[in-house]
Amino acid sequence: RRPPAGHKEHLGMGSERFAFKMEAVTPEGERIDNEENKPRNILEEIVWYKDYELTLMKEKMPLSLVRGQVKLAPPVLDFKQAIIDQMEKTGQPGLIAEVKKASPSKGVIQPNFDPVKIAKAYEEGGAACLSVLTDEKFFQGGFENLKLIKEAGVTCPLLCKEFIVDAYQIYLARARGADAILLITAVLDNQDLKYFTKIAHSVGMKVLLEVHTYGEMKRVLSGDFEIDLLGINNRDLGTFKVDLNVTVELMATELGKEVKERNIVMVGESGIFTIDDVNVVQNAGCGAILVGESLVKQDTPDVGIKKLFGRPL
């Protein structure tokens, strides 16, 4: 059903066409056909390829098999509560530390990438939760990293950081040990958000809904689905440019007032490198932060956490 795709020559697989055209989702949730049949930005390229990738994954491991593995997965940990607990304990935003090897904009960030070693260092450094990149082509991650980290005995709740466009990915995330998933509003309309949130909740996982614009945030807040956590990504996924003021400006609108009144846990994402940055998003109203590059590129990520917060957690 999703996402619509273009033809294979853009994916490096010859000229045979898929049956679909590329679409975009406006901040209001309306779909727009891409008549040029080619990705217009990095986000569309990622989502476009995801459709092909999922076709291969389903051929290799059918959904019925994945759902069977969900029943054998480790017990779900409460991702949201772990953040709240740290926030109340420290008086600072709960830390979601990201296990990340590379990105489309920066290339390889940590050449000596060892997901288990990094995850353990984050845990020792006091992270409330971990975010694990599972996209293979663009971020050099994988769903197996979730499993490796969980089997290594790491007790922090895990977020599956993936460009989710299909229910298959949600079940696979839980089967590999994830406790929460990310849903990106720029990729999904409200029908998708409601449907995928329902599936995640059915297997015990929490959902981090991500927005970047006023329109996306307004759409999510008006949706008829439960919001566990709401993240504001300071990175424009179309260009991968980062601006910390995105969080500040959105939280200064009436929407920021609404999330405070509804007691929604807000997560500041991307562009957080210093204690000053932490203070900026906290003062804007964020109870948690998701940090990757500034921590993972260091040889001692646990020390990086101390530097980021100005003290041990």
Q: Which residues fall in each region the model found?
A:
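Glycine/Thr-rich beta-alpha phosphate-binding loop at enzyme active sites
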Residues: 99-113, 118-140, 219-257
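Glycine-rich phosphate-binding active-site loops on the catalytic face of alpha/beta enzymes
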Residues: 132, 172-192, 231-240, 284-305
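Glycine-enriched alpha-helix->loop->beta-strand junction motifs that scaffold or abut catalytic
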Residues: 126-127, 152-156, 175-181, 201-205, ...
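Alpha-helix-loop-beta-strand connector modules within alpha/beta enzyme cores
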Residues: 77-90, 140-163, 194-210, 244-264, ...
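Active-site mouth loops of central-metabolism enzymes
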Residues: 32-33, 43, 96-116, 156-165, ...
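An N-cap/entry alpha-helix motif that binds or orients negatively charged groups
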Residues: 1-110
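C-terminal helical cap(s) of enzyme catalytic domains, especially alpha/beta-barrels
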Residues: 7, 14-24, 246-253, 282, ...
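Catalytic cores of alpha/beta
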Residues: 17, 165-177, 213-226, 262, ...
